[in-house]
């Protein structure tokens, strides 16, 4: 039975990572490009949070979940700013400019940045080797961005969309860290649900206010529903359940598949070509993440697993 649970947990982890990976091409499908815009980044951000918030409210009521205690509101509020607003908004603006494959390379730094932010916010000491991996991964992203800027005719320099993607990674990382502070008390699934519900007073009226007046392609609405239901909600249930059943240490390694799944998903969904340079840089960044995660683990195992999105 234990082996079956571990196997099921691993597959649930892979399923959760797959849901998160498809977020990038689906977001670009929803927002469109600068030449052919669809849903506005603001509407997409507030709309996906509102959709997930309604589903979360139903779940919390159905399970008779108690209200968070007073000390838990601040971490949940910070998670709202990072995960419900900051990350999706910055990502949506960036994906109007760059391809989903391009964004997959930049956001591959998320697990490494999360560990670095945890060391800073929680005042944890990290080994020198970890910081060297963080620097190496960051340099790879900078070089990739510079190369891509040149091929796009932007000359030698970073595109502003790359800055937005880096800021999105930091926003998500801080949101994960603050959410993790209340996870032991509330439970992982309830944390993401409370984050979505807390955003409702802003996300729901904002969605209605910003509802598009112009005609929008059906594919954009498909992207909207996907990021609201699967990226923002269902994916976390699969991911956290997988961590619980299969073991956080084993299942968390499946998130290393995320940038490659994003790149592969962008081929049929957006018609983006498979690029050897992009795949190569993604693999190199993932390698720094693997090394960094090993070096960030404490000498005496008592680690906290953080989900990536």
Residue ranges and their predicted role:
Residues 19-24, 57-107, 143, 228-246:
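Specific transmembrane alpha-helical segments of multi-pass solute transporters/efflux pumps
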Residues 13, 17, 46-47, 84, ...:
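Helix-helix packing/entry segments at the starts of transmembrane helices
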Residues 34-86, 113-114, 170-178, 192-210, ...:
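Transmembrane alpha-helices of multi-pass small-molecule transport proteins
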Residues 56, 126-148, 256, 265, ...:
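Hydrophobic transmembrane alpha-helices of multi-pass small-molecule transport proteins
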Residues 1-46, 54, 89, 152-181, ...:
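Glycine-/small-residue-enriched transmembrane alpha-helix faces in small-molecule transporters
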Residues 34, 59-60, 64-67, 91, ...:
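C-terminal transmembrane-helix exit sites in multi-pass transporters
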Residues 10-13, 71-80, 126-138, 186-195, ...:
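Cytoplasmic-side transmembrane-helix entry/capping segments in multi-pass membrane proteins
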Residues 5-10, 37-46, 68-74, 131, ...:
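Juxtamembrane helix-entry segments on the extracytoplasmic side of multipass membrane proteins
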């Amino acid at each position: 039975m234990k082996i079956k649970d571990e196997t099921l947990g691993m597959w649930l982890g892979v399923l959760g990572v797959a849901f998160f990976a498809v977020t990038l091409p689906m977001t670009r499908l929803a927002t469109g490009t600068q030449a052919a815009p669809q849903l506005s980044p603001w509407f997409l951000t507030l709309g996906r949070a509102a959709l997930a918030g309604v589903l979360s409210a139903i779940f919390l009521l159905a399970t008779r979940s108690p209200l968070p205690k007073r000390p838990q509101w601040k971490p949940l509020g910070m998670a709202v700013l990072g995960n419900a607003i900051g990350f999706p908004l910055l990502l949506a603006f960036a994906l109007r400019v760059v391809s989903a494959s391009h964004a997959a390379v930049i956001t591959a730094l998320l697990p490494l940045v999360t560990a670095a932010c945890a060391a800073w916010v929680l005042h944890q000491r990290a080994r020198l080797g970890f910081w060297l991996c963080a620097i190496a991964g960051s340099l790879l992203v900078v070089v990739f961005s510079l190369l891509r800027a040149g091929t796009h005719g932007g000359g030698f320099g970073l595109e502003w969309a790359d800055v937005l993607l880096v800021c999105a990674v930091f926003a998500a990382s801080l949101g994960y860290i603050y959410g993790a502070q209340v996870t032991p008390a509330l439970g992982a699934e309830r944390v993401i649900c409370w984050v979505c519900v807390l955003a409702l007073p802003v996300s729901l009226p904002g969605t209605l206010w910003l509802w598009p007046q112009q005609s929008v392609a059906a594919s954009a609405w498909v992207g909207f529903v996907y990021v609201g239901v699967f990226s923002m909600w269902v994916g976390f249930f699969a991911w956290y359940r997988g961590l619980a059943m299969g073991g956080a240490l084993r299942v968390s390694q499946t998130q290393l598949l995320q940038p490659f799944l994003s790149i592969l998903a962008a081929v049929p969904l957006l018609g983006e070509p498979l690029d050897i340079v992009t795949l190569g840089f993604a693999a190199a960044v993932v390698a720094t993440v693997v090394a960094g995660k090993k070096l960030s683990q404490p000498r005496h195992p008592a680690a906290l697993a953080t989900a990536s999105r």
